[in-house]
A protein has these predicted regions:
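N-terminal Rossmann-like dinucleotide-binding module
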Residues: 1-47
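Conserved SAM-binding strand-loop segment of SAM-dependent methyltransferases
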Residues: 49-55
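Hydrophobic residues in well-ordered beta-strands that form the structural core
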Residues: 53, 92, 117-119, 253, ...
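Beta-strand-loop-alpha-helix segment that lines the small-molecule cofactor/substrate pocket
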Residues: 66, 72-73, 77-121
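C-terminal helix-rich "cap/oligomerization" subdomain common to oxidoreductases
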Residues: 66-68, 296-355
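Predominantly a Rossmann-like dinucleotide-binding segment in NAD(P)-dependent oxidoreductases
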Residues: 123-201, 208
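NAD(P)-dinucleotide binding in Rossmann-like oxidoreductases
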Residues: 208-213, 222-295, 305-314
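N-terminal binding-site loop/beta-alpha segment at the start of enzyme catalytic domains
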Residues: 341-413
């Protein structure tokens, strides 16, 4: 396989796992960045590469093909945007961003700059997961009943990223994205689709003193009548397993997320039929789960693809939309969910706007663009501001709300 020259943003445990996995691939680690220069030095002493102080300094370095983003959730959008604008391919840790608006904007940047963007959901690449979806597709009928959990218990200070509001803490974003993802994919597998989004989400949970979810549960309702009950927690332990049933047969997976990574790269899928007869399917890989993810990304990179076939852009966007809805059930809100509180704008100013056809409306002293933007489908101020800014940055200046205001003005004068 051809070689990608990598940069890594972040020096935490997941960055270390990625750097270790790189040794199993043909990739080369060129540089590692941290806000703390000494941490970058310590990291590179163990895994190689050049230590860089400051994430943006690494992003602007020449000679790097792709960048793995392993920083806290609230920084994903800013760093991924900067990478894509410099045409550096991006493998971004899950969740791709804090909310669906940011994910939407990254996808747009990926397409505009013709640069690969992929969410790092390592479990989705693994043969075990693909086998699960194959069984669902070939041997099950809807509707399905799904139970999926990812829970653990840790005692961390309020400043830790898992529970810190300013760092995008909370169980839903950190690990709830897994049961949400596998539920959507299992339903999709029934219909030869990559995923199906739920039509209704009902959720509840426990919040900390920063109004961030320590644990959360949700019931997902799908159009075909399938139901998924999912749970995530950072203050409760569970088996963190997955079951998928159609009433006739049931799939049991006891290592759905790490797929045997910590048990000799061996895992097992159990199937029980209506007669309580068991079938065991053994899964074994020569490479670790993160190395498989890197190889998949590398193949997409050298095929000059903009997105992964197993983790396409619309999948990442759909999962983030569902996570947004789950958080809203618990009233978990981050500053980056509010357009008026964002520190980094979702849409960059476009200084080279094209001149569009315009028209004159009585009562106004300037022309308006002939293209009108509808204002009735924005989910929140964050989404609204992003859509309006994008509309205006492309040289368009007229909205339904503006037209309504003009009509009132004309009628009343």
């Amino acid at each position: 396989m051809k070689q990608i020259k990598w940069g890594i943003l972040g020096t935490g445990s997941i960055a270390k796992a990625f750097a270790e996995a790189l040794k199993e691939t043909d990739g080369e680690l060129l540089a590692v960045a941290s806000a703390n220069g000494q941490r970058a030095i310590d990291f590179c002493n163990s895994y190689g590469g050049t230590a860089i102080e400051g994430h943006m300094n690494l992003i602007s370095m020449p000679g790097i093909d792709a960048i793995y983003i392993a920083t806290p959730h609230t920084s994903h959008f800013e760093f991924a945007s900067a990478c894509l604008k410099q045409k550096k391919a991006v493998l971004c840790e899950k969740p791709m961003t804090i909310n669906a608006t940011e994910t939407m904007a990254l996808i747009d940047l990926s397409r505009k700059n013709k640069t690969l963007l992929m969410e790092a959901f390592m479990y989705k690449i693994h043969p075990q997961t693909q086998k699960i979806f194959e069984i669902v597709n070939k041997r099950m009928k809807g509707p399905l009943s799904i139970k999926a959990e990812f829970c653990f218990s840790v005692d961390v200070p309020d400043t830790h990223r898992l529970v810190n509001r300013d760092l995008g803490g909370g169980s839903i974003l950190d690990i709830g994205c897994y049961p949400m993802s596998i539920s959507r994919h299992a339903i999709g597998a029934l219909y030869d689709r990559n995923f199906v989004n739920p039509i209704k989400i009902q959720g509840e949970g426990e919040l900390n003193n920063q109004d961030i979810d320590l644990n959360a549960s949700a019931e997902l309702i799908f159009e075909d009548g399938s139901v998924a009950k999912i749970r995530s927690a950072t203050n409760l332990s569970s088996e963190s397993d997955v079951t998928i049933s159609d009433g006739e047969m049931t799939i049991y997976v006891n290592q759905p997320w790490h797929c045997g990574e910590f048990t000799g790269r061996e895992s097992q899928i159990k199937i029980v039929n209506a007669n309580d007869e068991e079938e065991l399917i053994d899964i074994k890989t020569d490479k670790g789960i993160y190395a498989l993810e890197i190889d998949h990304f590398t193949e997409a990179f050298f095929n000059e693809e903009l997105e992964s076939t197993l983790l396409p852009h619309n999948d990442s966007h759909g999962n983030t939309i569902a996570l947004d809805q789950w958080r809203k059930e618990l009233k978990v809100v981050y500053n980056d969910d509010r357009g008026e509180k964002r520190k980094v704008s979702v849409i960059s100013k476009n200084d080279s706007r094209d001149t569009l056809l315009s028209t004159k409306i009585p009562g106004l002293d300037k022309n308006l663009s002939r293209i009108v933007f509808g204002c009735d489908n924005q989910s929140d101020t964050n989404h609204a501001f992003a859509m309006f800014d994008h509309f205006h940055s492309n040289g368009k200046m007229c909205s339904i709300q503006l037209i309504f205001t003009i009509m009132v003005r004309v009628i009343t004068t």
